[in-house]
Amino acid sequence: MSNEADLLHGPLEDRHRDLGASFAEFGGWLMPVSYAGTVSEHNATRNAVGLFDVSHLGKALVRGTGAARFVNSALTNDLNRIGPGKAQYTLCCNESGGVIDDLIAYYVDDDEIFLVPNAANTAAVVEALQGAAPAGVTVRNLHRSYAVLAVQGPRSANVLAELGLPSDMDYMAYADTSFRQVPVRVCRTGYTGEHGYELLPPWESAGVVFDALAAAVSQAGGQPAGLGARDTLRTEMGYPLHGHELSPDISPLQARCGWAIGWKKEAFFGRDALLAEKEAGPRRLLRGLRMVGRGVLRAGLTVLVGDTPVGVTTSGTFSPTLQAGIALALINTDADVRDGQEVTVDVRGRAATCEVVRPPFVAVKTR
């Protein structure tokens, strides 16, 4: 682990320490990984509500005449599918079709798009966009201008309503409001598969919002949750994590994110390579694996059919919901592996039998 002094620190670190958090490095940031324990936090989010500080996530602003048109010519998804007050999952690709990052784009208006990339990739996304931006369009890195607080779970709407924050909105919509004189962007987004929200207050005012949310979450039977639970929750949903299921060497098609590509658009980064891959078919595809017996799967393990290696796990964990080991894996398409088929995974020399499944592993409840 990196020395704490070398890591970036969020605006709420003292509060997390007061709550008894344990910390770990993620994307160059020192972040709370757990409080009461990952399983407890996971189950609280699935059954009640969890409060996550994900302020390490990046923030960037594209502004100027035709900003939306420019972003639409750079990122994969089609911004014309949405409009002001809506958000969209999209990808920033390289010219070979690999993924620089996956991110959320918030459509403010035709001349302003707000972006939330991953922590470690913010500078790369900003650099890619700055290099392509036309005259009159600026791309600014606002990484430490805003915090991001996620309220996730079946009681999340009750928590926001209790505080007078907007909660009755469609999935992937957002609203700008204020809370105790602090401006807040409230978004119907998340990374858990549950009904939830992500709130963006100014970095320096995040404590006001966090304290109120923490009290309301506790009153609703929930608890603060760290990045450990965030990872088990997203893995159960089959959501990709950059550096695992997506990377400069892993395309959106291989990760089953082709739905986030506007194929009819005339331009976006990596378009020619991705069209060629779509025509030929990806050489590997993301699949889910569920252990038949006991054990835990991790990333980087070899997947075999018989004695033949056919892929590698990209993420793995113990699913608190299923009480079973699960994993995501990139499997070679020429191996003709089918859902329901049994394969083995080499876990430190032990052959672990797994069933191939199509994620999500548990029901989606985002809407």
Swiss-Prot record:
Keywords: Aminotransferase, Transferase. InterPro entries: GCS_T (IPR006223), GCS_T_bac (IPR022903), GCST_C (IPR013977), GCV_T_N (IPR006222), GcvT/YgfZ/DmdA (IPR028896), GcvT/YgfZ_C (IPR029043), TrmE/GcvT_dom1 (IPR027266). It catalyses: N(6)-[(R)-S(8)-aminomethyldihydrolipoyl]-L-lysyl-[protein] + (6S)-5,6,7,8-tetrahydrofolate = N(6)-[(R)-dihydrolipoyl]-L-lysyl-[protein] + (6R)-5,10-methylene-5,6,7,8-tetrahydrofolate + NH4(+). The keyword Transport does not apply. It is an enzyme of class 2 (transferase). The keyword Transferase applies. Pfam families: GCV_T, GCV_T_C. It comes from the Bacteria. GO terms for biological process: glycine decarboxylation via glycine cleavage system. GO terms for cellular component: cytosol; glycine cleavage complex. Its EC number is 2.1.2.10. Gene3D superfamilies: Aminomethyltransferase beta-barrel domains, Aminomethyltransferase fragment, Probable tRNA modification gtpase trme, domain 1. The glycine cleavage system catalyzes the degradation of glycine. Belongs to the GcvT family. The glycine cleavage system is composed of four proteins: P, T, L and H. This is Aminomethyltransferase. It comes from Mycolicibacterium paratuberculosis (strain ATCC BAA-968 / K-10) (Mycobacterium paratuberculosis).
